[in-house]
């Protein structure tokens, strides 16, 4: 594929970032309680899939190429979402002379940090389980889809880093509020509408928490109102609506989104589906018999594993199995369901869904893994 630039113009930054990444990986792992063997394995696994993604983009094209070209031109106004990624990338391209491959290694590290927080959360959920359940939980940390879609130049690596931080923060939100706030800010930069859901879910979980004092709940409710007033115009502008839009305008926007990304071999017609079917389609398709490429086939195997987890998880939920670890579960469930409704009802392209759903799946995976199996030890509190 003709690119119009040399993706290997330099690779000195790549070598430097690779070494710095290892050092930072070990330091972060120590802080969040992951052993060096696991963190190193994840690091090399993640960067391996980064290079797979890199060469795939060189051969087949992708958003990363457009981000790089726009960053070189450096004439995009400051804004959220795509504009933020372009301006952020432009600094490294135009001032530090990063090449295309250098940027992949940089964004790969952002995604890897998200994987570390995700892994730390999963380990906390499964460490009191019997061996088969622990192995099943570790499988999700090394799912190819997790590292593949979070290893490239683009919004997904930053969004997943924010997701991982929010999940880790929810395990002990009283002492990690700063991490949740940071995750909301990072998500705001790349996906403002999801950041809004993240924020509202967290505040609602505190308001509805009976353990939180009445005055604190009133305070958090006031904060939620103020933040909503400030953020809604930003989100409305970001998604392309106008202030004062009514129900019909929102409905038209959803219809437009359903057809906007309904092109290509991985597109499906979701306009005639019920909302529950849209949600199931978003989470679990493509299935193996629907795969149109090797990457879709690999993703379909991941989806089979996710289906197995959901079946096991809800079986143990109906058995009233207690979670293996304390966490702000209301926050996690609220964020998962609200985000799923928004994303599932506006995404008709399975290729886009395969990437974007990793902003919400870590929450579901943690919630279900924490209840499956028979716990060998008492429920543990995270300090």
Residue positions per predicted region:
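Membrane-interface alpha helices of multi-pass inner-membrane proteins
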Residues: 147-148, 164-170, 178-203
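Short acidic/glycine- and proline-prone juxtamembrane loop motifs at membrane-interface regions
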Residues: 151-155
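Transmembrane-helix motifs of polytopic, lipid-linked glycan transferases
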Residues: 22-28, 105-127, 308-312
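Alpha-helical transmembrane segments and terminal signal-anchor/GPI-anchor hydrophobic tails
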Residues: 188-191, 196-309, 316, 321
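Membrane-interface helix-loop-helix junctions at transmembrane boundaries of multi-pass membrane enzymes
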Residues: 172-173, 312-334
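Extracytoplasmic loop-helix module adjacent to an early transmembrane segment
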Residues: 35-79, 247-250
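Transmembrane-helix signature of polytopic, membrane-embedded enzymes
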Residues: 35-37, 118-142
